[in-house]
Design a protein with these regions (language model features):
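Active-site environment of non-heme Fe oxygenases that use a 2-His-1-carboxylate facial triad
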Residues: 1-51, 59-62, 105-298
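Long, mid-chain structured domain cores
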Residues: 37-107, 115
Length: 298
């Protein structure tokens, strides 16, 4: 779902600077959340935040793109703009950074010499959930577009994970529910529990609920038994079959409910080596944790 900001709300937000955020460990401090919540006194802010929440947790929902492009044009993409994006995120859940060596917002640029399948690579970034091998993955992953690929590539892709699972055979689903999968490393992480290895792709929740712990990268980079690999490959095919894709524009803020949707990115356009490093695609990533007792991400 794409959500436009009403023009009067945009004008009011431009005139309402927010204070710098403070962190409690790696989480946005409650004092900052309370200060940012003063934006609810602006007409249409709460209504817009409610639309955002419904798009993420309402029936049939699971992702939203908040169109903040006019705010980015007016304010630039520096601290003032990022504070506004953080304020909207805090209406959904608690912003945090699981990476101790990174700031709250993690910069995802383009590195032409990086593994093409990585988030900062230039190739196809297949469907996955972030921090798939943590016992408590972020409930939401969010991406703020600072600059799209100037050559026109790299549309975002999303797919309803539970809808894809529902199209599989009962045999494949039973294999995906076995603790037989593993992927990646786990170090210097905070707020996401412990390493989960091995893990099931389906966690035994009722149909349509819980995480679908999947990353297509494990099909190539993890040693899996043949039957389990085949079941995971079938899931990957169904995710592609049900995908939606769109190009993020400057200021677009994509928020994904990880309990419902998996995400990825098509390859960037060829010729990235001709684009100066300072002119390549840039996204900023922020993670969110559902509040204690909040079933909104279930």
């Amino acid at each position: 779902m794409f959500i436009d900001i009403p023009s009067k709300l945009e004008a009011a937000l431009i005139e309402r600077p927010l204070p710098p955020w403070e962190l409690d460990g790696s989480f946005l401090a409650q004092s900052t959340i309370e200060r940012y919540r003063k934006l609810t006194t602006i007409p249409r802010f709460e209504e817009t935040a409610a639309m955002l929440s419904h798009a993420l947790i309402g029936e049939g929902g699971g992702y939203a793109v908040l169109r903040l492009g006019n705010l980015a044009k007016a304010l630039g993409v520096g601290d003032r703009f990022r504070r506004l994006a953080t304020a909207f995120a805090a209406e959904v859940a608690v912003p945090f950074s699981p990476f101790l060596r990174w700031p709250l917002w993690k910069d995802i640029g383009v590195k032409i010499d990086k593994d093409p399948g990585k988030s900062s690579g230039i190739g196809y970034n297949a469907f996955h959930m972030d921090l798939v091998n943590a016992t408590r993955p972020p409930d939401y992953t969010t991406l703020l577009c600072v600059r799209p690929d100037p050559l026109g590539g790299g549309p975002s892709i999303l797919s309803d994970a539970h809808a894809a699972v529902a199209r599989l055979s009962e045999h494949s689903r039973s294999l995906l529910a076995e603790t037989a999968y593993h992927y990646g490393t786990f170090f210097d992480l905070f707020g996401v529990g412990e390493e989960y290895k091995p893990f099931p792709i389906l966690d035994g929740s009722d149909p349509g609920e819980g995480f679908v712990r999947f990353t297509a990268k494990m099909l190539e980079r993890s040693k899996l038994g043949q039957a389990h690999a085949d079941a995971a490959r079938e899931l990957a095919e169904e995710l592609v079959r049900g995908q939606v894709s769109f190009m993020l524009q400057p200021g677009d803020y994509l928020i994904v409910n990880q309990r419902r949707f998996l995400h990825g990115r098509e390859a960037l356009h060829s010729g990235q080596e001709t684009v100066p490093a300072a002119g390549r695609r840039v996204l900023l990533q922020l993670f969110l944790r559902a509040r204690a007792g909040d079933g909104s991400a279930a």
